[in-house]
From Swiss-Prot:
It is found in: Cytoplasm. This is Protein-export protein SecB. The gene is secB. Its main location: cytoplasm. The keyword NAD does not apply. GO terms for molecular function: unfolded protein binding.
Amino acid sequence: MAENNGNGSTGAADTGQRQRFQIAKMYLRDVSFEAPGAPEAFRDEWKPQMDVELGTRHQPLGENTYDVVLTITVTARNNERTAYLCEVKQGGVFRLEGFPEADMERVLGAYCPAQLFPFAREAINDLVVKGGFPQLLLAPVNFESLYQQQKQRREQGTSDSAPSGSPDNGGRQ
């Protein structure tokens, strides 16, 4: 019987092997906050235009172990000036066993980033508030939908070139 210590789930795979998902480590890989509009931005009425970009990548670390990084970049413009730029790279080390190859890309490209998102969202909010700006609560993200859209773009890209600046960087770099 496979051990489940509360960090993952188990279930039967086609091969008869149990599936196992475990979060081994969450870590803040990189963080950046710039406020080129400060202190003038604090005098203006706050009606910002927000630009949020998401990116993911993953790489194997060893047998059944993967490093996944979610990058979120937020640019706030107020009165046509950049008030702040905030970027967080939230990383996680995941152990995956027993998943069919067809499911691995989906787990790494959608499920793992979804686990990282709450931590990245909190880090961004903390940085924005410490920068003197109103809190920023990013809306939930449907990573499964983003993954499917990127997968379709990649499949269509076999006959014509795919756009290079896609929001999730192809799920893999």
